[in-house]
Each structure stands twice: as structure tokens, then as C-alpha cells.
């Protein structure tokens, strides 16, 4: 391990990998460190991503695609299922990835581009000089090394500590952390081409339950509920076990994954002098769906591009790096996060009866395409009273 790099990236998930690949392709010296002993494991993700979203960063490869989705379903609290055909999304729905293989592919590409990669390497503290970040102390194979860098990109996930160490408030309120559990199950009867979402306060309070196929008779079956709704006897696992017992009584669980997902607004600021936060560390997960793969790759790539420009200009100050923060907030992704946060806040306050009404109403709409924005617009046309309930959000998208 060298003692000096242009860019030091902490975290080997999709955000860190795209940052490393992009920076290396631009000719910068790059060090990517991952605290776990293997890239891509353990998987803490439902593994879904849209086709067009994926293609923006990497061509699809059967090696790391578990299943191709051609539709989706949303199940209301009363059991009514609304079906969404692929034609509503222009025939471009999405994939269920094999994240263990996918994440490694991204990091391999970063390494091929010239990035140095170290696993089982933890950033234990920042190196500060005159109040400015200069790098990090890395614990690697039983010893500590000081590595300096012109800029550090923190891609250290939902548990991100590095930003906090550098003075950025990364605290997430308990109510905005989803407590999540997922089983990888086999020998279950499913529609192998459709992702299914279950809503309702009896099924998943202030959250949802999902079935994401990974083959003809295999799927990720998981749940995310609000942290404030979790407690003894009503943990996320308790709700999931009840669902599995009813829906897949003869299914076999071959893996159990637990974790937390932030469904809050993004951090107030995602940069400091010589520092940028990306992906889950920046809290850019979609607050409505909990999805974060695309947002992670987008912010990782953008951060590296801005870093390269700022290094070339010799200015890594917070003011110079703010172009990254401004650009992702102004992007389609950033606007979607803000809109979906308001939708999420609206939906979690609704009783099951209201959720039933909304889903039944949507099922009757003549949707030519399906997206969150289209859905809300059509709902407002069909239910003008929602204008008052949705308030500023409704006004902003009319």
C-alpha cells in the first residue's frame, strides 16, 4: 500500500466501485478500501434495478443477473393485487441482480482501470492538519498505515462513520431507519417474472414486504418496517415469519440477511474540505422504495468526475467540491428523492382502509406508462380531494 494517492475511497460497494473506476479511468492514482474480507458479501439488498438505470453504467451480463422482470404487482391490505405489465414501462422493467457477483465485477473493473484495492481494511480515523482532511489511518492485516490523499470519497454505507468524524452530521432519526430482514428462499410458488410488493399496517407497518424472484422457484423475500414500529414481539422478523408461514409454508430458507436502510432526506451537505460522501453514506437511498443501487453508482461516478476536475485545478476546498452536491440535487435522481420523500411521508400516515382505496383507484386508471410521477398525476385527476392531502407536493407536480 502506497502512502499517498490522489483519491482515497472508503467502501467497496457500488458507490465506491464506480468512484474508483471513474477516477482511475481519468488517470488519477486511486486506493479503494473495503472493511469486509470479500467484496459483495454479505448481501444486504433486495437486488433490484431498472434496465435503463443499469445500462447507464455497465452492460448487463448473465453472470450477475439472477432474473429479468417483465412486470410487478402491488398487494393492498385487503388482499387485492394490482398488476403492472411491462408495457406500462415501455417493456423495460428491470433485473434482479446477484450482488455478490455484481459488486465484484464493478471492483474488478476499477482494478483493471488502475485502482489499488484492499479488502479487510478499515478506515479507523481521519488524518487532519490545520482543520483540513489529509487522508485516513487504515487498519490493514493487523497493522496501521497513514495514507494521505488529495480527496477522500466516503462510500462507507448506512453505518457511515467517516463523515461524522470529519464534522458532517450523518445522524438518521430512528423513525427514518427501516429495520429490514430478508430471506433467500427456494422451493416456493411464485411468478418468476414479477416483483410483488405487499402493503398494510398488519403486514409491514410504515413499510412494505417484497418478493423479488431469483429464478423459477427462488426469491428474495424480505420486509422493511419503520424503526419506531419495531420491538419485542413485533420485530421485522416477526412480521416476515408470519407472512412466510402463510404464503410459503413449504419453502426453504437458505440465507437470512438483516440490516438497516435510511429512508430520510439526504444529508444537508455531502461535502467538506477534501471530502465527499456518496451512496448510502450520503443518505441518497430512495425514501419511498428503499432502493439505492442506481443512486449509489450515480453519486459515486459524479463524485469522481468532480474530484478529477478539482484536482486538476488544485482546489479541493468545500466551496470547490460543492459542485458535486449541487449537481446531484438538481439531477433527475435528486428531484426524485425529494418527491418520493413527501410521498413516503404521506403514505405511512394512512390507515389500511385508505391504502385499499388508493390501490383500487390506481388499478382502474388507464395508465400508458408507470412511474411514480405519472401515478401521482393520474391519482390527482381521479381523486381531486388528494390535492388538499398532498399539499405542496401535489402543487409541485401538476
Swiss-Prot record:
The UniProt catalytic activity note for this protein reads: a 2,3-bis-O-phytanyl-sn-glycerol 1-phospholipid + 8 oxidized 2[4Fe-4S]-[ferredoxin] = a 2,3-bis-O-(geranylgeranyl)-sn-glycerol 1-phospholipid + 8 reduced 2[4Fe-4S]-[ferredoxin] + 16 H(+); 2,3-bis-O-(phytanyl)-sn-glycerol 1-phosphate + 8 oxidized 2[4Fe-4S]-[ferredoxin] = 2,3-bis-O-(geranylgeranyl)-sn-glycerol 1-phosphate + 8 reduced 2[4Fe-4S]-[ferredoxin] + 16 H(+); a 2,3-bis-O-phytanyl-sn-glycerol 1-phospholipid + 8 A = a 2,3-bis-O-(geranylgeranyl)-sn-glycerol 1-phospholipid + 8 AH2; CDP-2,3-bis-O-(geranylgeranyl)-sn-glycerol + 8 AH2 = CDP-2,3-bis-O-(phytanyl)-sn-glycerol + 8 A
- The EC designation for this entry is 1.3.7.11
Keyword line: FAD, Flavoprotein, Lipid biosynthesis, Lipid metabolism, Oxidoreductase, Phospholipid biosynthesis, Phospholipid metabolism
Give TM regions. Answer: none
Q: How is the cofactor bound here?
A: Binds 1 FAD per subunit.
Keyword Transport present in the record's keywords: the answer is: no
Reported cofactor(s): FAD
Per the record, the GO terms for biological process are: glycerophospholipid biosynthetic process; membrane lipid biosynthetic process
Q: Which GO terms describe its molecular function?
A: flavin adenine dinucleotide binding; geranylgeranyl reductase activity; oxidoreductase activity, acting on the CH-CH group of donors, iron-sulfur protein as acceptor; oxidoreductase activity, acting on the CH-CH group of donors, NAD or NADP as acceptor
Q: Which family does it belong to?
A: Belongs to the geranylgeranyl reductase family. DGGGPL reductase subfamily.
| Name of the molecule in the record | Digeranylgeranylglycerophospholipid reductase
Which species is listed as the source?
Methanoregula boonei (strain DSM 21154 / JCM 14090 / 6A8)
